[in-house]
Amino acid sequence: MQRTQIVDALAATAPQPVIRLCGWVRTRRDAKGFSFLEINDGSCLANIQAIVDEGIPAYANIGAVSTGAAVDITGELVESPGKGQKWEVRVQTLTLLGAADAETYPLQKKRHSDEFLRSIAHLRARTNKYGAAFRIRSEAAFAIHEFYRERGFFYVHTPILTGSDCEGAGEMFRVTTLPVEGSATPASGNRYENDFFGKECNLTVSGQLEAETLALGLGKVYTFGPTFRAENSNTPRHAAEFWMIEPEVAFADLEEDMNLAEDMTRTVVRRILDRCAADLDLFNRFVDTTLVERLRQIADEPFARCSYTEAIELLLKSGKKFEYPVSFGLDLQTEHERYLAEEHFGKPVIVYNYPKEIKAFYMRLNDDGRTVAAMDVLVPRIGELIGGSQREERLDVLEARINEMGQNLEDYWWYLDLRRFGSVPHAGFGMGFERLLMLLTGITNIRDVIPFPRTPGNLEF
């Protein structure tokens, strides 16, 4: 018999004489002559109640059906006389698919700490909080693909292994087949020419440069995949492995780039509000009681916008004492970003035209010679959600910027070719997917919105 998901069973419009469900037992409660099972299969937040009568043959083994056990049941879907849900199942057959020892199964019917659940990340998807978080993660990923498809973008794949450093920060994971001892260093006698690719190889920090090459042939593209940063930051906002959404648009300027970033953010928020009401309600009740209200504001109201220069002036006039200094030429820190988004504007704000010294070489130099056509989207409770720019399309200016940043022109010969052959204005941005999920759920630690977090000192699973 075909299996029905619990989300569909609970949405039934009429009783069913026979239905088959599979799932994990959340609780078992025994009464005289029968037992109540709460079963969840991950398809939704809600459990379904199954009533097992002592008259069925499988009832003899009901003692083995403990919290965490996997079961396969068939029975009649009937209206539930109790409050809380419309349907329940009167079990006709019950098969124990996988037992779970009640003494050692780590998930019991109580609220576990996030720290404890990170230590059993292989099981935490069975909890209400993390089941909801990962369903929202799935729905958000689908909404992003949907957004770009509706607007004529092509989804492209960029390499994980790379010989270039998009950010120029040098915080990259090295990949090598050379002996680990000494790796490719002069002292070890190992050379990059002896390595697998014959040159230095790293895990990508961004698919942007490669996406630009595809945009300057396909017009509008986006990439959505994993990126890696060997940044030894043990903070709630940083992970060594995370996912990025990176669109690139030919013939676009900074204004179009900012419009796209805002449109994408608001559209995805709107779709999560529409499609994940039950899961959002969980986070609104137990994680952040202002979550849904804040998401509705993001969906409904245009973002604020101000230049970097204006942002610095607002921070200086705020009267607040910040931990990090505020001055033209210094990058905005998280405390500055959050003040602008939370306290001054009270909603997301796009800050644009940053000093060239604090931005990457590929960002277009403005006519003032001091700033670049860069933008960041700052959101309440998080800070930076998106970073983007109009890309530098002028060959001579780009070469000068690469030299200024101490990069090797030869490493970017293919990137410079884009400016030699039919160069056009173009723009793009990167959004950290996990930061978007923190915005959508109210979860404050990036380790809790990705199934298996990779952070300094943590490589389990």
Curated annotation (Swiss-Prot):
EC primary class: ligase
The entry's keywords: Aminoacyl-tRNA synthetase, ATP-binding, Cytoplasm, Ligase, Nucleotide-binding, Protein biosynthesis
Cellular localisation: Cytoplasm
InterPro entries documented for this protein: Aa-tRNA-synt_II, aa-tRNA-synth_II, aa-tRNA-synth_II/BPL/LPL, Asn-tRNA-ligase, Asp/Asn-tRNA-synth_IIb, NA-bd_OB-fold, NA-bd_OB_tRNA
Main location: cytoplasm
Chemical reaction(s) catalysed: tRNA(Asn) + L-asparagine + ATP = L-asparaginyl-tRNA(Asn) + AMP + diphosphate + H(+)
EC numbers on record: 6.1.1.22
Domain of life, source organism: Bacteria
GO biological process: asparaginyl-tRNA aminoacylation
Pfam families linked: tRNA-synt_2, tRNA_anti-codon
Subunit record text: Homodimer.
Family: Belongs to the class-II aminoacyl-tRNA synthetase family.
Protein name: Asparagine--tRNA ligase
